[in-house]
């Protein structure tokens, strides 16, 4: 292992003791101070962000994720304040029992320890991760992408300056160099890192899962479907589909495939009408193509190929699949889903119940946009990632997901027979 990286990880592990000694009220004050510092230095953050943006083509799908403007920074500041004001997740009593032999047994929440997060493009993640880890008593190792190097480095400087003002050990957070070659060393850091969370492309997530010797929670990649049922309301459908697809195409909760009941194909042109205003390219199956031909801009309509389904576009592109019934819709989702976010638009309660019960995803929606799959929108303040697995955490991961528990047993000299 690279000596410098090894030293950083050892220092981070050692710093867990110092972090555990910081009282909850102090952690809250420090986070509020960080929020104020971020707000104070908005122009400097934008300047550093522009350095990163200048090295990327504006047409690159990552460009929007990399961009930090005043509005996004203020939203980030607000998220930090929300996290600061959340209840302390540590020391929560999950179970308590007095045994017949006099033993008192409790199960209480504790930090996970050292959390490494590997992420791409989005520098706002740097602040989200630190605020959640700090509030939950976890040391964080940040491994951002080279495309956000200037922005991440400046954000880390603001974090460390805030900690120094409170005489806090700054080893509780570190930003590793962006070189990809260092990733394997991090993934092999058994005994130093307690959990790794990859946030980014499917290729990144696959690499981490396949090469890690430390525990991993998979997050990110979203192959998202919305099913418009036979009973779907046209007005709701138009708004939901447009929002889920075009609000922010570069995020993991953006719509990738619209599934439509065959009996509602006549309404398809109206359902997707507003998408043409955003130049959304539609990859339509045979039935959908036949209906949209002459009813959607010719240059934006393409006959779908098999590979267009089960694809995370992260762009102004949408696949459309026609099905004869809700069972076929669910079967299609189960075949291609990444188990992130899936939605149904329906008025028939039995159809809604069937969809919400049978679809296997971290977040399932009825008559709402999948754009809501987000820690802030779920009342978590922020998120460290959106887990697409079932063990330990699932869906947006807030403070609770960053804790484990330990058993505390008090006795008066008891021994076991």
Curated annotation (Swiss-Prot):
GO biological process terms on file: L-proline biosynthetic process
InterPro entries: Ald_DH/histidinol_DH, Ald_DH_C, Ald_DH_N, G-glutamylP_reductase_CS, Glu-5-SA_DH, GPR_dom
Pathway the protein contributes to: Amino-acid biosynthesis; L-proline biosynthesis; L-glutamate 5-semialdehyde from L-glutamate: step 2/2
SUPFAM superfamilies: ALDH-like (SSF53720)
Gene3D superfamilies registered for this protein in UniProt: Aldehyde Dehydrogenase, Chain A, domain 1, Aldehyde Dehydrogenase, Chain A, domain 2
GO cellular component entries: cytoplasm
Subcellular location: Cytoplasm
Listed GO MF terms: glutamate-5-semialdehyde dehydrogenase activity; NADP binding
Superkingdom per UniProt: Bacteria
Catalytic reaction equation(s): L-glutamate 5-semialdehyde + phosphate + NADP(+) = L-glutamyl 5-phosphate + NADPH + H(+)
Family from the record: Belongs to the gamma-glutamyl phosphate reductase family.
NCBIfam families per UniProt: PRK00197.1, proA
Known function: Catalyzes the NADPH-dependent reduction of L-glutamate 5-phosphate into L-glutamate 5-semialdehyde and phosphate. The product spontaneously undergoes cyclization to form 1-pyrroline-5-carboxylate.
UniProt protein name: Gamma-glutamyl phosphate reductase
Source organism per UniProt: Legionella pneumophila subsp. pneumophila (strain Philadelphia 1 / ATCC 33152 / DSM 7513)
């Amino acid at each position: 292992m690279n000596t410098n990286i090894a030293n950083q990880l050892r220092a981070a592990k050692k710093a867990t003791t110092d972090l555990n000694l910081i009282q909850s009220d102090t952690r809250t004050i420090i986070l509020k101070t960080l929020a104020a510092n971020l707000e104070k230095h908005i122009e400097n953050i934008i300047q550093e962000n522009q350095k990163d943006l200048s090295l990327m083509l504006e047409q690159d799908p990552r460009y929007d994720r990399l961009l930090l403007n005043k509005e996004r920074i203020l939203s980030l500041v607000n998220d930090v304040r929300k996290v600061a004001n959340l209840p302390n997740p540590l020391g929560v009593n999950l179970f308590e029992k007095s045994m017949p032999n006099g033993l008192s047994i409790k199960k209480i929440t504790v930090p996970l320890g050292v959390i490494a997060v590997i992420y791409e493009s989005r520098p706002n993640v740097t602040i989200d991760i630190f605020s959640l880890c700090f509030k939950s008593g976890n040391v964080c190792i940040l491994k951002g992408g080279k495309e956000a190097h200037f922005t991440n480095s400046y954000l880390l400087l603001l974090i460390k300056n805030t900690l120094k003002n409170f005489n806090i050990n700054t080893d509780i957070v570190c930003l590793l160099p962006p070189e990809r070659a260092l990733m394997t060393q991090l993934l092999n850091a058994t005994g130093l890192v307690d959990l790794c969370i990859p946030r980014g492309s499917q290729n990144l997530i696959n690499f981490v899962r396949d090469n890690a010797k430390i525990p991993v929670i998979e997050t990110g990649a979203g192959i998202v479907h919305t099913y418009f049922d036979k009973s779907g309301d046209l007005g709701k459908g138009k708004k939901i589909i447009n929002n889920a697809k075009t609000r922010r195409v570069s995020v993991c909760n953006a719509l990738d495939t619209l599934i439509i009941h065959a009996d509602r194909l006549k309404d398809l042109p109206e359902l997707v009408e507003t998408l043409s205003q955003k130049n959304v390219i539609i990859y339509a199956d045979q039935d959908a193509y036949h209906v949209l031909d002459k009813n959607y801009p010719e240059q934006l309509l393409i006959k779908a190929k098999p590979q267009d389904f089960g694809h995370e576009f992260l762009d102004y592109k949408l696949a459309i699949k026609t099905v004869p019934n809700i069972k076929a819709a669910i079967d299609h989702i189960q075949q291609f889903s990444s188990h992130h976010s899936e939605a149904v638009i329906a008025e028939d309660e039995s159809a809604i119940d069937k969809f919400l019960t049978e679809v296997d995803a971290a977040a399932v929606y009825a008559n709402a946009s999948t754009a809501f799959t987000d820690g802030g929108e779920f009342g978590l303040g922020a998120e460290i990632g959106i887990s697409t697995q079932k063990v330990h955490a699932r869906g947006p991961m807030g403070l609770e997901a960053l804790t484990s528990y330990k058993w505390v047993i008090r006795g008066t000299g008891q021994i076991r027979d």
